[in-house]
Regions:
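Extended, highly charged
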Residues: 2-285
Length: 285
């Protein structure tokens, strides 16, 4: 597991180059609310956010929310904030992730799909500033237990879930990358359960899994949390199965996105990601 420890440079661009820059822009526009008192990730975060949608708020009254003092039901305290609603709580927030007006969204998507821009590779990426491997993943309170993963639907979900993910896999036959948005349930300090069969024919990651299963090999996967909105937006988009979402993200931004090599699996990942969880998905089922 690796993560970035940097702060936003505040660099101005048409589309935010990373998640920190996006949050800074939202805050400057009054679209991000910071909650600094203790908030329980298991029982309070998502009910507070959902209240904006079911409690009578108009869309232009909704805000993204950053919880900076996160605790768990077992007495856990976390030094990582949780951000909710910062990608698509409103049309305006979504459009700000692309650096365009709401009226330009459809045009920008069509341009990006028709004219993708290939990513560029970089070394010494921000996402590798902090790397956690080996025994540090399985010790008490280590690994995934360091992350304040919330319960999305208290009373219904069987586990805390990462939701706004970018799950990176690669076709073992063609080498084509896929980036999908799949919920990842926390099972242990070093284990997540990821559901990739999210469409009738199988999502891109699931089709890759089927190929690895035929090869009798586990599937390398990198789960990205917190990166440039244009990268996240490609995950749930229904693109051609052999189209590289990272290139489409470049088309959305109007410039190449930065990628780097993962530390433990043969995949390229967003270089400016906040958190990357690397691992293998078992195919011996």
């Amino acid at each position: 597991m690796s993560k970035s420890s940097r702060k936003s440079s505040g660099q101005s661009a048409a589309a935010p180059s990373d998640f920190q820059e996006h949050l800074q822009r939202l805050e400057e526009r009054g679209l991000l609310v910071r909650v600094d008192w203790p908030i329980n990730k298991d029982t309070e975060i998502h009910p507070l956010m959902r209240w904006q949608f079911v409690g009578g708020y108009l869309e232009d009254q909704r805000k993204a929310m950053m919880f900076t003092n996160v605790v768990g039901s077992g007495g856990e305290k976390y030094d990582i904030p949780v951000v909710v609603g910062a990608l698509a709580a409103t049309h305006e927030i979504y459009a700000m992730g692309m650096g365009v007006g709401v009226d330009k969204l459809a045009d920008v998507w069509m341009r990006a799909i028709d004219h993708p821009i290939e990513p560029i590779y970089v070394d010494n990426a921000p996402c590798h500033e902090v790397v956690i491997t080996g025994d540090d993943l399985t010790k008490p309170g280590g690994g995934l237990a360091l992350l304040p993963v919330p319960i999305s639907t208290p009373g219904f979900d069987a586990a805390p879930y990462l939701t706004a993910t970018v799950c990176v896999t690669k076709d073992p036959e063609t080498g084509v990358r896929n980036m999908g948005t799949y919920r990842a349930g926390l099972k242990a300090n070093d284990r997540l359960g990821v559901r990739m069969a999210s469409r009738l024919s199988g999502a891109g990651g699931y089709l890759h899994w089927q190929k690895y299963k035929k090869l009798g090999q586990p599937m390398p996967c990198a789960i990205v949390v917190g990166c440039a909105p244009v990268v996240v937006f490609t995950g749930p988009q229904k693109l051609a199965i052999d189209q590289d979402e990272m290139a489409v993200a470049g088309g959305l931004a109007g410039r190449p996105m930065r990628v780097t090599r993962a530390k433990t699996v043969d995949l390229e990942i967003p270089a400016d990601a906040e958190i990357v969880v690397e691992g293998l998905i078992d195919t011996d089922l």
